Amino acid sequence: MKNSSIVLASASPRRSELLESAGIQFRVVPADINEEPLPGEEPVDHVQRLAEGKARAAAELAEGRFFLGADTIVLCDGEIMGKPKDAVDAERMLKKLSGVPHEVVTGFAIYDRERKGAVVEAVRTKVFFKHLRDEEIRDYVATGCPFDKAGAYAIQGGAAHMVRKIEGSYTNVVGLPLCEVVDALRVIGALGN
């Protein structure tokens, strides 16, 4: 699965690690775009729009043929949770997630410069948190881990003990639905098979 024409439009170390774990060769060219939701925008439309925007923005910055963009949010009781603004926001998010199921939604887009088109998908995973004590939340926030993660937690890190179960893709919760991304890369010819 080697192909140097794949560009990851993300600075996320977790997304890089996931692609590396699949044996995919790629370069990283982070793309910075406005991530504010549009008025009335549905969550799935939001992450898909941002993913495609990041992929196309990276194509303006770098050589290559295939540009992979992604965006992840957490949905809980109708609230779209991105990355927390500060410790108070992180604690608020974790208190809201405590003891209730929520969804992690990742949109990804693979922009093909040669064909001037993109494959855009979204994957949803249901996550069930245990009830969290205030002390647990404060201790976790104090580690600094929540600040660059949607919903203020990392399932693969210090928040693993908070999760009772998931329904769907584990790698989606980490930040990139690897099965679906690899399948899409293969279908559009980015992996050469």
Swiss-Prot record:
Location relative to the cell: Cytoplasm
Catalytic residues (UniProt): 71 (proton acceptor)
TM stretches of this protein: none
Keywords from the named record: Cytoplasm, Hydrolase, Nucleotide metabolism
GO molecular-function term, one example from the UniProt record: dTTP diphosphatase activity
Superkingdom of origin organism: Bacteria
Keyword Transcription regulation: no
GO biological process: nucleotide metabolic process
Catalysed reactions, as listed in the record: dTTP + H2O = dTMP + diphosphate + H(+); UTP + H2O = UMP + diphosphate + H(+)
E.C. code: 3.6.1.9
Cellular component aspect of the GO annotation: cytoplasm
Cofactor(s) listed in the protein's UniProt record: a divalent metal cation
Important for substrate specificity, annotated site positions: 14, 72, 156
Family label: Belongs to the Maf family. YhdE subfamily.
Function: Nucleoside triphosphate pyrophosphatase that hydrolyzes dTTP and UTP. May have a dual role in cell division arrest and in preventing the incorporation of modified nucleotides into cellular nucleic acids.
Entry-linked NCBIfam families: maf, PRK14368.1
Protein name (database record): dTTP/UTP pyrophosphatase
Organism of derivation: Geobacter sp. (strain M21)
Classification of source organism: Bacteria, Pseudomonadati, Thermodesulfobacteriota, Desulfuromonadia, Geobacterales
